[in-house]
Amino acid sequence: MTLQESDKFATKAIHAGEHVDVHGSVIEPISLSTTFKQSSPANPIGTYEYSRSQNPNRENLERAVAALENAQYGLAFSSGSATTATILQSLPQGSHAVSIGDVYGGTHRYFTKVANAHGVETSFTNDLLNDLPQLIKENTKLVWIETPTNPTLKVTDIQKVADLIKKHAAGQDVILVVDNTFLSPYISNPLNFGADIVVHSATKYINGHSDVVLGVLATNNKPLYERLQFLQNAIGAIPSPFDAWLTHRGLKTLHLRVRQAALSANKIAEFLAADKENVVAVNYPGLKTHPNYDVVLKQHRDALGGGMISFRIKGGAEAASKFASSTRLFTLAESLGGIESLLEVPAVMTHGGIPKEAREASGVFDDLVRISVGIEDTDDLLEDIKQALKQATN
């Protein structure tokens, strides 16, 4: 079946990347073969030679992700971190990068512990729009943003960042990368606002079932795609056919899962924001009080805030730990974006490797709790939050 330009997101989610099977199977088979027959030397029968280079299941997933991000090209990797590593590996030695300070701990670790050892220097800022013109240098090759950020849910105007890069005298060779993991392609499409590459830890919302580790990227820049595709094959950090198949299956219900999680998260965030007795502050893009709500209205489908919330609890680190250990439906675990609700304390978990001073400068305090709202009943989740707050603050 050929998709039409008028087809909506749900239709694309179900049918993009659809396979053609000689047996007529409705759901694509899993192609586990590592190698493919050739009719004569260097003359493959089909389009595949060796599964590290390409595999039917991976290709179908890549095409599907590209379609949902309004992109021409997609690539899949063995993890979100492998996606990040491959992009940074594409930069010339001696390059400079700019990143928001409030970034996923694993990304911060790669910038500071790996990329710098290979000749890529990174400048971090907590005020990107104001600082970017001064931070871009002659050797700057990349700007990296998350929006919303992990875990404080700051929202960045992607178009403004893209415009700043274009206007800068040294901006012509700078690529803008946006990590869209927290929202998924259902809520936002960064390429529409000037990003050069959009990346996801597909482990999270795209797969959505907490049973696959996988990363993806999408782009409309052909030379950039060809360079990254070369590195994908050369480095070999690719997902297995089964993981690609599982992720593609999860993607088909993305719109249903993400919308439900976002609707529940909005109600939970409103409750937390009203609880002045137990809660210091709430970070959630769907709240009209969010400092960048005007950007949310522009960049997010239906002004949805997504399924991620963070909040500071009264009582400090001890209260945060007690709250995280007192929930019934929210499982204390790292990761996010699955059908089940999760929570964590970033200061000692996902962001524990970031120095305290840098962490707190980005708003990640010891009393911060991050929750990933799943698709359980909204009222049940609210009751769980209420009882855990009571236990933690009394």
Swiss-Prot record:
The keyword Chloroplast does not apply. It catalyses: L,L-cystathionine + H2O = 2-oxobutanoate + L-cysteine + NH4(+). Catalyzes the production of cysteine from cystathionine in the reverse transsulfuration pathway for the biosynthesis of sulfur-containing amino acids cysteine and methionine. In this pathway, homocysteine sulfur is converted to cysteine sulfur. Also has cystathionine beta-lyase and cystathionine gamma-synthase activities in vitro. Cystathionine beta-lyase may be physiological, while cystathionine gamma-synthase activity is not, as the required substrate O-succinyl-L-homoserine(OSH) does not occur naturally in S.cerevisiae. Its EC number is 4.4.1.1. It is found in: Cytoplasm. InterPro entries: Cys/Met-Metab_PyrdxlP-dep_enz, Cys_met_metab_PP, PyrdxlP-dep_Trfase, PyrdxlP-dep_Trfase_major, PyrdxlP-dep_Trfase_small. GO terms for biological process: cysteine biosynthetic process; cysteine biosynthetic process via cystathionine; positive regulation of hydrogen sulfide biosynthetic process; transsulfuration. Pfam families: Cys_Met_Meta_PP (PF01053). One of its GO terms (cellular component) is cytoplasm. Substrate binds at residues 52, 104, 109, 334. Residues 37-56 are annotated as: Disordered. The modification N6-(pyridoxal phosphate)lysine is found at residue 204. Its main location: cytoplasm. The modification Phosphoserine is found at residue 362. Pathway: Amino-acid biosynthesis; L-cysteine biosynthesis; L-cysteine from L-homocysteine and L-serine: step 2/2. Belongs to the trans-sulfuration enzymes family. The gene is CYS3. Its cofactor is pyridoxal 5'-phosphate. Present with 38300 molecules/cell in log phase SD medium. GO terms for molecular function: cystathionine gamma-lyase activity; cysteine-S-conjugate beta-lyase activity; pyridoxal phosphate binding. This is Cystathionine gamma-lyase. Homotetramer. Keywords: Amino-acid biosynthesis, Cysteine biosynthesis, Cytoplasm, Lyase, Phosphoprotein, Pyridoxal phosphate.
